[in-house]
Amino acid sequence: AVDFDKQCVPTADPGPCKGFMPMWWYNIFTSQCEEFIYGGCQGNDNRYRTKEECDKTCAEASATWDVNA
């Protein structure tokens, strides 16, 4: 099961490292997966290698997520 609050709600967090890794994150305000640059360490769980993985995890789960829960 998807932990929507942990995997899809936080904003993109590139972390403190200086790598250059294009990743995807789910933006709850636009209900879209968006690209960002990940530094390679730390960050949060709202980070996906592909848009498809992001969509599958968060876009589908957002349909049943209750903002007031």
Swiss-Prot record:
One of its GO terms (biological process) is envenomation resulting in negative regulation of voltage-gated potassium channel activity in another organism. PROSITE patterns: BPTI_KUNITZ_1, BPTI_KUNITZ_2. The record marks K18, G19 as: Reactive bond. Keywords: Disulfide bond, Protease inhibitor, Secreted, Serine protease inhibitor. GO terms for molecular function: serine-type endopeptidase inhibitor activity. Disulfide bonds join C8-C58, C17-C41, C33-C54. GO terms for cellular component: extracellular space. Residues 8-58 form the BPTI/Kunitz inhibitor domain. Pfam families: Kunitz_BPTI. SMART domains: KU (SM00131). It is found in: Secreted. PANTHER family: BPTI_KUNITZ INHIBITOR DOMAIN-CONTAINING PROTEIN, KUNITZ-TYPE PROTEASE INHIBITOR-RELATED. Serine protease inhibitor. This is Protease inhibitor carrapatin.
